[in-house]
């Protein structure tokens, strides 16, 4: 089932490398005790820079957990709103999409992933990401930690193990690994979660053209696969 809101998106949006973060609004005042940092992330599950950004965000959180508590919410974005549900060869798809830039881009991603201790895998299929976003929404109903951990499982599978992001078995198994209950039943009905994904797309992602895109405590907004220190600076600025 196609999302109505996707008709307003260009066929291909942008998966972004890092750029310098800008403070977009005044920081929230300090509160007694540990400050809660709320992070909203717009991403697509086939965007490698979204995974890079997540890993760097995790590093920043680990380095800051003695100062802050964190709540992370993931929201949908569609790099290719017309991608086929049945899946197509990943390498061939990106070779066609990027043309002469493909080889250089893949070399760059391989280098970046190795810097994270991972091997970038271009095998397998790519395609429509709606079911993965439906599942991420469903996971969020069972807790932000489970949702965050699910995003990790999906990214590990798709980017390093050649798993297809639209494969039902892979989605359900990823949900099982992070303790999400009822995933198979939820995904069985193709209408489940579509309305909510549409609403989140409109609320969090309709104004952006590339991902990953972060909003910290509703104040600081930046995009791209940022290094950990960018996140840490944003946490500190918001606390002052």
Task: Give residue spans per PLM region.
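N-terminal chloroplast transit peptides
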Residues: 1-7
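C-terminal cap of thioredoxin/glutaredoxin-like
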Residues: 13-14, 20, 39-43, 54-66, ...
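A short beta-strand-turn-helix
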Residues: 23-37, 200-203
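Short active-site neighborhood of thiol/selenol oxidoreductases, capturing the structured segment around
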Residues: 34-48, 53-54, 72
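Residue-level preference for long, well-ordered alpha-helices that form the structural scaffold
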Residues: 46-49, 98-102, 193, 227
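Structural alpha/beta surface segment adjacent to cysteine/selenocysteine redox centers
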Residues: 55-158
